[in-house]
Amino acid sequence: MVKQDYYEILGVSKTAEEREIRKAYKRLAMKYHPDRNQGDKEAEAKFKEIKEAYEVLTDSQKRAAYDQYGHAAFEQGGMGGGGFGGGADFSDIFGDVFGDIFGGGRGRQRAARGADLRYNMELTLEEAVRGVTKEIRIPTLEECDVCHGSGAKPGTQPQTCPTCHGSGQVQMRQGFFAVQQTCPHCQGRGTLIKDPCNKCHGHGRVERSKTLSVKIPAGVDTGDRIRLAGEGEAGEHGAPAGDLYVQVQVKQHPIFEREGNNLYCEVPINFAMAALGGEIEVPTLDGRVKLKVPGETQTGKLFRMRGKGVKSVRGGAQGDLLCRVVVETPVGLNERQKQLLQELQESFGGPTGEHNSPRSKSFFDGVKKFFDDLTR
């Protein structure tokens, strides 16, 4: 039976770097791993092919031999006893790729995931209601573009730690007990960098500022948080990057107040309009609209304008605009206006105007009863 090309098995090109090969291998190994495909002989065979291709293409000597001679380079024991004739060594996979997910690892400490970042973004009410796209600039740690996160000088590879032999742990004996501890030489990574990258000095990451375009959905409010996956700090030595969280803060608006998906505003009217009624213009986020004010309107009355509020970022009906009327006392009156008001007051039957002011009548009736009770 003709064996499939190792590069085709992993789905990479013949010029692929080791980093690309490892990435492809991890993805395929996770898919075809026997623990995920119990009893599936085809998946087990596919997994062995993937592991075989990975072991050859990540070993510089074996890869060079394969590139020159193909599969013939490893026939009849050509791999020096390391071949693939026997069953696949799943414990290596557990340790290198899946760590403690399947519980069979060798204890190697995986490189740390990058830290999450937070960015506080101030928005106007209009931006929060309608949605907006904003560019932000953040300082972060990015993967070194020279060593691609390995920390090693280009052309070199991290070396297996001589203390723990790549396991990331050492065994300490205390009497009858053996205790495993993180290797102090490599800090649990299992490898050491002999020739560090000149740009990142072996860290695999460099400090840099980057600009991102952030799309803010319509309807967000103060306290909402937007997650940008993978836009946090780069992970150590090729580990996954962290996330960026954009925290929303909506600035105070000069006219509107927001409560949930509803907007509130105060609308001043003069007392003649309040008494007689009429039509006024009120502001909305979409422009001015007409509002009919009925006669005998009192301060504090709310008028609801449906659908003129905020559309929820989580879906559902749009909120309303509630206009709270404030009846203003006139100021700066001329003599003619004062005279007319005096005549109006007299027509009410005195300062209280009980017949035309139901709240005043109720108030003064209560005051009268209070003093009557005191004198009994």
UniProtKB/Swiss-Prot annotation:
Which residues participate in Zn(2+) 2 binding? C161, C164, C183, C186
Zn-finger (CR-type) intervals are 131-209
- Cite a single GO MF annotation: unfolded protein binding
Q: What is its main location?
A: cytoplasm
Q: Which CDD domains match?
A: DnaJ, DnaJ_C, DnaJ_zf
* An annotated GO BP: response to heat
- Asked if the keyword Transmembrane helix belongs to this entry, the reply reads no
The cofactors named for this UniProt entry are: Zn(2+)
The entry's keywords: Chaperone, Cytoplasm, DNA replication, Metal-binding, Repeat, Stress response, Zinc, Zinc-finger
Matching entries from Gene3D superfamilies are given as:
DnaJ domain (1.10.287.110), Heat shock protein DnaJ, cysteine-rich domain (2.10.230.10), Urease metallochaperone UreE, N-terminal domain (2.60.260.20)
Subcellular location(s) per record: Cytoplasm
Co-factor: note? Binds 2 Zn(2+) ions per monomer.
User: Where are the CXXCXGXG motif-type repeats located?
Assistant: 144-151, 161-168, 183-190, 197-204
Residues at which Zn(2+) 1 binds: C144, C147, C197, C200
- The J domain covers 5-70
Q: Which GO terms describe its cellular component?
A: cytoplasm
Recorded domain comment: The J domain is necessary and sufficient to stimulate DnaK ATPase activity. Zinc center 1 plays an important role in the autonomous, DnaK-independent chaperone activity of DnaJ. Zinc center 2 is essential for interaction with DnaK and for DnaJ activity.
What biological function has been recorded for the protein in this entry? Participates actively in the response to hyperosmotic and heat shock by preventing the aggregation of stress-denatured proteins and by disaggregating proteins, also in an autonomous, DnaK-independent fashion. Unfolded proteins bind initially to DnaJ; upon interaction with the DnaJ-bound protein, DnaK hydrolyzes its bound ATP, resulting in the formation of a stable complex. GrpE releases ADP from DnaK; ATP binding to DnaK triggers the release of the substrate protein, thus completing the reaction cycle.
- Report the family membership: Belongs to the DnaJ family.
Complex and partners: Homodimer.
What is the protein name given in its UniProt record?
Chaperone protein DnaJ
What is the name of the gene encoding this protein?
dnaJ
